[in-house]
Amino acid sequence: MAMVKMIAFVKRKAGLSREDFRRLWVEEHTQLSKVLGMKGYRINIALEPQPGENEPPYDGTAEIWWEDIESMQAALASPQNELAAADVARFADVLHFVYTEEFVVL
């Protein structure tokens, strides 16, 4: 059975350094999120642009997955998720979400 996944595209808050963005998200915010019944949680932080390249449109992505859609819906409707969602405002200005069904190929 395929896992249900939420993929978040995140732009850091204006004026926030890359280091503070990483710390607030990876070290602090994840502590609020760990109790949402998820089966996995991956954060990907964008690297500094190479010389001659533009800034990426997002500073990072998160992949969070659950066993099934009911588990995801219960987690997203929980009071704990309300706290986690409010905490995001400390480090992010822009969030876009895509909800997917994962198919592992390799």
What are these regions (language model features)?
Residues 2-106:
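Macromolecular interaction modules
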